[in-house]
Amino acid sequence: RLQRIILLLVLAFYSLVLCAQFVDYERITPHPRLLLTQGGEEAVKKSIATFPSLLKVHKRILEESDEILIQQMAERVMEGKRLLSVSRLALKRIFYLSYAYRMTKEEKYAYRATQEMLSVSRFPDWNPSHFLDVGEMVLALSIGYDWLYEYLESEIRSIVRDAIVEKGLDAAAPDEWFYRAASNWNSVCNGGLLYGALAVFEDVPDKAKKIIERCLLTNPKALSAYGPDGGYPEGFHYWGYGTSFQVLLIAALESALGTDAGLSEYPGFLKSARFMEFMTAPSGEYFNFSDAVNGVRCNMMMFWFAKKMGDLSLLWLENQYLENPSVSFAEDRLLPCLLIFCAHQDLSNIQPPSCHFWHNGGKTPVFIYRGGWNSKEDSYLAVKGGSPLTSHAHMDAGSFIYEREGIRWAIDLGMQNYLSLESRGINLWDQSQEGQRWGVFRLGNMAHNTLTINNKRHLVNSYASINRIYKSEDKKGVEVDLTSVFADDMEKVVRIIYLNEEDDLIVKDELVTGEKEALVTWIMVTPAEARIVGRNQIELAKDGHRMLLTVTAPGDVEMKLWSNEPTHVFDEPNPGSMRVGFETYLPANRRNFCLLYTSDAADE
């Protein structure tokens, strides 16, 4: 233990030395210094005049800003243990209004932004017990304070500055747990605090430097999650959240201090943009593993990555979304960032990516094959490994998403709203083997496209690795080692899942039993209608397409159709979906193979 403490102290000292080398506080830019520095408006105006899709985004921000003018001020209303929705509302309003003022110079926007800042500054606190709420609120006030600095009267500046310091910077103890976290909490909380420190730097330089240096010391923990090759352990949904704030953090360092102190160079971070691109299937839906919702949304942070890496192919999908008049945006409260990041980028000749395979290791290994980038009918296979102990994870090792000819045949039900569970007393964050989290239908293994042995939960203290990748024309897929997931009941479990030359799905499970026989339950969640049509066969039908599932196994197989009706009063309904699959008993002390393959159903 003493050696560990000494090592940490040495690392801390070394990091502070590096920080001193990287950061020259004498170079801090004048206000406005966060994201869009003085005169940066002209580049934004040029880009929105050049590209109609960006002009639509600009007009959207102005229209929503006009709507904000007649709405009531944000109030301190808690939702369970969170103030987060209020922080996000304040952030959206202040960011939009400040942008509108800088682009139009119409004082109505600056005045209302000022009133919003004064309103939340008067809150007794910003709910530091759930520090994400503080992180987003500090970000909101820091942008308003910085962007409207010349507009604000000195008395108002003082009120807002004091709120940033007392309810933001001072609320973060040096030993806050999020400083040690490798999750989105690190990026969000560090990001908000960094903005606060940079915004009020002149008035509290010593305090601001401590916040900045603590950020540079602890933020690499969050960046380590992207290694080694860009996969994000928490899935696309929290990539959108955590990475948005990570980008904001880096961009603020660059705009205010002229350096990101090497943060963007951490292994895997920049590569994660390609991970995110592959998370979107040809249908426009996502590979929504872990706590994630589905849908089609433009992610504005991709424009930062494209600019940083000089790779416009990262915008192939995002640019298409922008052309949609009804486009929605991930983390839309940050929408002005899109126009800031698009400045000095030529969006007129974006080409599709040239790659069709993605694979990452790390905490949550993922494999994806995408048949193309130009058609909704391109095939798509996405498979994951990992552990239930990862932040926001489900019991879904070995699960997959499968699309073909425009149909998503195998789906993930996604997350359930946190408040709907917490308000009923469910301890959603207990990830122990008997934790209540796994009693939620959508989060357990029985609601995912994977195996269940003897009707038991997956072992939480397990890790499913991807051991082999197949990239040939007739075998595009992966081998996942599930042995540790079922270590209490099986000697070995390996899943090989791939698409053949016709892009039919083949799932081959190798299962080696121990001293006792084992009941194997094979499940696939689908939005299709299903019927058992014969021995070892199920037919799926959706949108005029039909697909046949055929099973071979060493013993008798019982084909199964399961309803996705809620099993507990706290479970949300799952309309338009069901589960299909089979059950079979495997004898003791034997190596067994269960094979499921798809094919086009014959016409009746």
Give residue spans per PLM region.
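A short, hydrophobic C-terminal helix/tail in secreted or cell-surface proteins
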Residues: 600-604
